[in-house]
Curated annotation (Swiss-Prot):
PANTHER family, per the entry: INSULIN (PTHR11454:SF9), INSULIN/INSULIN GROWTH FACTOR (PTHR11454)
Subcellular location: Secreted
Protein species of origin: Chimaera monstrosa
Residues spanning the signal sequence: none
Name of protein: Insulin
The gene coding this protein: ins
Length: 59
């Protein structure tokens, strides 16, 4: 799965594409309580993320 760096309006556009009518939020849902949570900017702009990562921010 290709990953890419998404920042600013590119990140918002990608979220609209992936989440559609479900909408999205900027803090991830914790998968495990001990896992440190990265915000979407840290995950997808400072680093790279995939469409699957983005889907974790959909409502």
């Amino acid at each position: 799965v290709p990953t890419q760096r998404l920042c600013g309006s590119h990140l918002v556009d990608a979220l609209y594409f992936v989440c559609g009518e479900r909408g999205f939020f900027y803090s991830p849902k914790p998968i495990r309580e001990l896992e440190p949570l990265l915000g979407i900017v840290e995950q997808c702009c400072h680093n790279t993320c995939s469409l699957a990562n983005l889907e974790g921010y959909c409502n």
